[in-house]
Amino acid sequence: MAHWVLLFAAGLFFIIFSTFSLWFIRREYRLYGKLTWLGSVIHCAMYAPHAILSGLIVGGPATLPPMSFGTGIGIFLMIAGWSITLYAMNFFRTFSRWLGNDTPGLTVNGLYRFSRNPQFVGYGIFFVGLYITWWTPLTIIGMLAYVALVYAVARVEEEHLKRVYGQAYLDYCNRVPRFLGLPK
């Protein structure tokens, strides 16, 4: 019973904090054209409730489940997902640029030729691996929560990028899918 109460509380906090974070980030992009230090902290912290919720959903993975084909696939996907995320973030070179505060030019090389949000794709692959490794029926909820969060964040970031880069960004959007797919 206590686990369900904690899970419900974490889920509710995830929804409230994510909604507030998206509102705050959108507001900062519109008012200042970038994120302030507080907006940057909130942007990063926005993913923590999902990670906590995911840990609760899978029961707090303290040890690996018995090795099986599924466990091996899950571990491989977690490693691959983190690798993709870190590789994609490397193209920004600085934390300030990653948060959208340093905008010398549109990043369109590397993994950004195939996805406008490869860091979200990588992080999503990590969570698929996590959920395969520590499968419970609730993992579907965790994945749906992640998809909803990154879709909303991508929409907020795209509004900002359209204002900053104009037609160059719109052309990029026409060539490259938001998350997955082949470039046009």
Task: Describe these PLM feature segments.
Residues M1-V108, I125-H160, V164-K184:
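Membrane-anchoring alpha-helices and their flanking helix-loop junctions
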Residues S115-V121, F179:
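Loop-to-transmembrane-helix entry motif
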Residues L106-N117:
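Short, amphipathic, aromatic/basic-enriched membrane-interface segments that mark the entry/exit
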